[in-house]
């Protein structure tokens, strides 16, 4: 691994530990040339299915797009980065376990919603409002009633 500070190839691993529910290995490294320390993350490279959009267009899976769509409703919520990364890993794992070469964006959206629902109700409603295209306040009330069926 080359040092990001001086580009030397003489680096060593100081510490390794699992992250994101075991889906990543976090490594602290030290450069033997400039003595700077840096962190790297190691993940298994897997092939994700392609995404079939509602228009019928087929796109390659985009981890960054998934991440952006999840991080937006989680803004200013008390969710740690580790919890966010773990949720992203669970979503990707569920999609891979389907064993399909192509998955509809609707199925992916429902998986995201189910994960958000278990993580944070506010983030879930934020995501649902965009995903389900809420047109008025009644749609918000209905969705909140669905996640809290015992409240009147």
Swiss-Prot record:
Binds 1 zinc ion. Keywords: ATP-binding, DNA-binding, Metal-binding, Nucleotide-binding, Repressor, Transcription, Transcription regulation, Zinc, Zinc-finger. PROSITE patterns: ATP_CONE (PS51161). One of its GO terms (molecular function) is zinc ion binding. It holds the Pfam family ATP-cone. GO terms for biological process: negative regulation of DNA-templated transcription. Its cofactor is Zn(2+). It comes from the Bacteria. PANTHER family: TRANSCRIPTIONAL REPRESSOR NRDR. Belongs to the NrdR family. This is Transcriptional repressor NrdR. It comes from Psychrobacter arcticus (strain DSM 17307 / VKM B-2377 / 273-4).
């Amino acid at each position: 691994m080359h040092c990001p500070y001086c580009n030397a190839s003489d680096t060593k691993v100081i510490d390794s530990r699992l992250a994101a529910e075991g889906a990543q290995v976090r490594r602290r490294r030290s450069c033997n040339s400039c003595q700077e320390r840096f962190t790297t993350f190691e993940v298994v490279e897997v092939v994700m299915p392609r995404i079939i959009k509602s228009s019928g267009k087929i796109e390659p899976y985009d981890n960054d797009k998934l991440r952006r769509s999840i991080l937006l409703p989680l803004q200013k919520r008390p969710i740690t980065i580790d919890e966010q990364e773990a949720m992203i890993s669970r979503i990707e794992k569920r999609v891979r376990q389907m064993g399909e070469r192509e998955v509809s964006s609707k199925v992916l959206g429902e998986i995201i919603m189910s994960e958000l629902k278990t993580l944070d109700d506010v983030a879930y409603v934020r995501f649902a409002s965009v995903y389900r295209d809420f047109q008025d306040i009644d749609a918000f009330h209905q969705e909140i009633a669905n996640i809290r069926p015992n409240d009147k």
